[in-house]
Amino acid sequence: MQCYTELLPPSGVTHALAIPFISATAENLVVVKTSVLQIFSLLKVQHHLRGGTIEGKSARPDRVETTKLVLEREYPLSGTVVDICRVKILNPKSGGEALLLAFRNAKLSLVEWDPERHGISTLSIHYYERDDLTRSPWVPDLSSCGSILSVDPSSRCAVFNFGIRNLAILPFHQPGDDLAMDDYEFHLHQDDFNQVSDHVGNDLKSKDRTVYQTPYASSFVLPLTALDPSILHPVSLAFLYEYREPTFGVLYSQIATSHALLPERKDSIFYTVFTLDLEQRASTTLLSVPKLPSDLFKVVALPPPVGGALLIGSNELVHVDQAGKTNAVGVNEFARQVSAFSMVDQSDLALRLEGCVVEHLSDSTGDLLLVLSSGNMVLVHFQLDGRSVSGISLRPLPAQAGGTIMKSAASSSAFLGSGRVFFGSEDADSVLLSWSSMSSNPKKPRPRMSNVAEDREEASVDSQSEEDVYEDDLYTAEPETPALGRRPSAETSGVGVYIFQILDRLPNIGPLRDITLGKPASTVENTGRLIENACSELELIAAQGSGRNGGLVLMKREIEPDVAASFDAQSVQGVWTAVVALGSGAPLVPDEQRINQEYRQYVILSKPEAPDKEQSEVFIADKQDLKPFKAPEFNPNNDVTIEIGTLSCKRRVVQVLRNEVRSYDIDLGLAQIYPVWDEDTSDERMAVSASLADPYIAILRDDSTLMLLQADDSGDLDEVELDDSTRAGKWRSCCLYWDKAEIFSSTVPTSKQRTHCELFLFLLSIDCRLYVYRLPDQQLMSVIEGIDCLPPILSTELPKRSTTREVLSEAVIADLGESWNPSPHLILRTESDDLVIYKAFASSIKGESHTHLSFVKETNHTLPRVTTSDKEMQSNEELSRSRSLRILPNISDLSAVFMPGPSASFILKTAKSCPHVFRLRGEFVRGLSIFDLASPSLDKGFIYVDSKDVLRICRFPSETLFDYTWALRKIGIGEQVDHLAYATSSETYVLGTSHSADFKLPDDDELHPDWRNEVISFLPELRQCSLKVVSPRTWTVIDSYSLGPAEYVMAVKNMDLEVSENTHERRNMIVVGTAFAWGEDIPSRGCIYVFEVIKVVPDPEKPETDRKLKLIGKELVKGAVTALSQIGGQGFLIAAQGQKCMVRGLKEDGSLLPVAFMDMQCYVNVVKELKGTGMCIMGDAVKGLWFAGYSEEPYKMSLFGKDQGYLEVVAAEFLPDGDKLFILVADSDCNLHVLQYDPEDPKSSNGDRLLARSKFHMGHFATTMTLLPRTMVSSEKAMADPDSMEIDSQTISQQVLITSQSGSVGIVTSVPEESYRRLSALQSQLTNSLEHPCGLNPRAYRAVESDGTAGRGMLDGNLLYQWLDMGQHRKMEIAARVGAHEWEIKADLEAIGAEGLGYL
């Protein structure tokens, strides 16, 4: 009984689409990352420049405008997206366009944006998994076939090619169309546009107009052979522009293409254009172009002014216009060998077009940008003669023009207009680019692209004279007689000079190729000032990226700040900081222009002396040190401090105490005392919480009343007279907020034009209503109902189900996000330290001029720690009374909120992510505050004190990404990292890397003398491999060991090997397995290397270079060495070499002596031992999994069991669970299989068969599986009896960490019987009751299978965590159906997540 939980979502972008989605005028980018849907908006941002000149001509402007991506919403999908398209529909809710998504297994989903919910709304889901379409035994399964989705540019219909030759056609209603499907009639007049709705299957006729309930008509499925009987092997299809009826082009062949049969099947591709008659469900062939090159693989429809279609092949580009006229260009020397089609020769470019992505750059010129699989960019230019294309020219972009921005292959692209284009990648970061163009002709300088008509005419005139020479070649219609006019690539006049630069990027850590654990290196010397640095026991390092983008990624489950200094802080309970201006009180200058000497930073520490007394110690920050500051007038009565801040443009320091408010000057001399008691009744009152926003102070008193103070121009405080409702109200929490985004300001119509942001006061009443007041006029802007019901949407309407409510302790309105784009969020804190995050948005209602304030609930699956003792519970209660949420306006250029206590956490958000809760490394944080202006290295840092009486000055770790649920740091290597291992003795990492290199046949081969006569300039590429040593102190390469040509690194492992047969000494070694790949006709060989990372004399300027690889042993073997593992207790290793698995021992002479072996079958890619047991698994890529045992007296390998399903093993790992032994296997279809070795089961034939217990679809292609120990989570510690002996047994549990090519990281956890029953019932309830994005079914997506007897289906942890996102009433309702308490379910959810990895 196991549970699969996705810890990190996929990060590689698979699809991208530009669409006006949120509104009719919005600029949105929709991004798909395998099974995650993200909706971005393009935001124009003003960036600051620090002077300088451009080419010495003119000074730069102070600010420059750039474009950034801002995430609107994110949705995990229960399906794998295979394509996306945009569709114009009738009467969308947002006014924008709809999104059509195609999923694996022949599903289509139509979604639109719902502005009232600030999210997507599913319009329809279409299934095409009918049995009659896939009944043929020779037709492959739908999941094994590719799919193509294309939508007509006028959105009249969509075609979906699934299976092999099945074509689904989905018509859409459009204004003024003449659609008649079956019995449907549609007549629409111009006056009826505002009254058109949707249509589902029956007409609702009323007088002279037809009203539809859905935007689509009935779809139908046709075989492609119904269009043309010769379409037997479809390749690609796409709808074309500038046709009155829906028209698309199909690229296909009548016989299967084959490079091996190229002489017989040369030029076998056809391109045919069909127009659809939706009324008759028929098609008409408009044109057909035969005998096209056999390596064409894609159709790209081109908009005006070029028009037609571009056909992309491995060696050429072919353009076909609407009349069927073709223009082609060959881009390497193989184009003339593989095809007799007429094309212009640009073979000197030597381009490889496999896996390329093409996107048009401008609607005016028709230029295209081609991104190759290497990441290099090529500009494609069409010579236009009026509306006719007279030629194609290509020019690679140089590096100085941005041609090498993409480090690896692109997977998708989107044209965003205004000189912007987006390229998504699965192997590197996805980038948003901007481009500018300049003329390449110095004689005739051309203006920028704004003048469309003149540019197009000039391009035609300039290129006409040159292209006349090649006119005959370009218009030749007989492919049998090639006319290859050779033209150097440099002569591409008419091709403009484009310069690209990066505007923004989406970080990607995929594909994750290998993973290992290592000890974190201390980058700071442990001096007297550094008492203790909180860090994890181990760190998780993964090899990520492809090609030049290869590198490492450091994964941290919690934030480990860079500590600059730490101090002993005995009995310190709180820390505050205050920055004052030392000048004459001039207004603050921007952060970029401030000078440190103009400001002074105070640090105030609070030490309790009695239950109601605290001593305040004042220090001045001097770089990284704290110097005591004498301030006799600062809190002389030792009252308890509630809040400290500054007012009057940082000229006054304000200290809010329980009984009074004290105001000080910049030298902390007392300026004013303002009492907290009620002046009307003279009753003694005490302050409970406070909120500061210059020039106001909002104080909440112990009788739940509000006190509002305002500072005048001189800094003196005076109480603001409140209106009757505010003064008489009983409040639970108060907060002041400057509305920079103007979201709250737009909720009430106003006649005056706002020139600056406004200040708002948020009050949470005792009955949990949120009142929004504008200051200074105290106008009530909005009242949000049912806050404690925690519904998905908070608005002015009371939730329908409001009987069950959560007990809230605090509500805060604060900015979250990056400094250039903070957005307001409502953060609610419950009594149990649960954090609920809402994002504010303004929803518009038709017929009203102003908008309404609403809040949408953000996902937060981080559970608070459960306290384990009465002492901790008591300290937690004291903290909750005195220490509230801390608002951090700017910490490392991020606006954040911090929650102190046992679950000390930051709430962080970047522009490209949702809010995430990151734990601060450590157990208990008493107080935290911003620490700024000390030194450049500590700018925008923070200072905090923990339960170990340590005060630390630190900042967020540098170069760390907070876009995901874990803190990530990417380290570039510049080469693809295929394997890595941690050398424990030297505390370094050894990488197996590779880079592309040209391959040439050896001239000295005696068996093949004909190789010497080969004349070729376009050489094939192979991977040149090497070993590198990386120091974790600086994350730089300190040593390298190159391997021979055609020798590939297949495995790198760290092992504790016996190095002497006489002394039996054992040392830590790095074992490397390689394979020599000389070609399929030459038997493969391999080699086993044994290295030791030794200590050497370092470079004085580089002290980290004190380690080097030393070759200890080397053994050439027959067959490729594909997998390695340590085995047994004598320091031996087991290697998969060819079709054998052999146990070897290292001899003193460096050779590896075989002692035992086992015959395998095809290709062994997994060999692992359950450490210390001698039991091992061997996974074959084709023939399944073997479970064997190794014995040392005598040396032999024994087969215990084998799976009977012939699984295609991609990765495998043991998973012990008590007295049961499970084996997890990931196959090539993204499935996870659970096998069990149980010789007592009759079905196992005395253990000869591994029993298949369950099957689970992960949705991601697994790359590694790693068995990790599991630590007890806080709920298990709290429930465990300290005197019980079961504590030790609970800690002996394991988890399996799974990485994938998409960048996702998952974990499989064994679940006890009682918890499994609860979670299984909860999963069934959530599957049936939740509204799933795009209408998908999680149960069908996971395709959970089990043997039905002893086996249980695997649980979906991500689906279970959605229970936390529900409203309080529904949450309790489902818990009651499951028959469990809320704390039981939370404890179960904590156990299946990442909390069990307490050492990371």
Curated annotation (Swiss-Prot):
The keyword Nucleus applies. It is found in: Nucleus. Residues 436-472 are annotated as: Disordered. GO terms for cellular component: nucleus. GO terms for biological process: mRNA processing. Transmembrane segments: none annotated. Keywords: mRNA processing, Nucleus, RNA-binding. InterPro entries: Beta-prop_RSE1/DDB1/CPSF1_1st (IPR018846), Cleavage/polyA-sp_fac_asu_C (IPR004871), RSE1/DDB1/CFT1/CPSF1 (IPR050358), WD40/YVTN_repeat-like_dom_sf (IPR015943). The keyword Cell membrane does not apply. One of its GO terms (molecular function) is RNA binding. Belongs to the CFT1 family. RNA-binding component of the cleavage and polyadenylation factor (CPF) complex, which plays a key role in polyadenylation-dependent pre-mRNA 3'-end formation and cooperates with cleavage factors including the CFIA complex and NAB4/CFIB. Involved in poly(A) site recognition. May be involved in coupling transcription termination and mRNA 3'-end formation. This is Protein cft1.
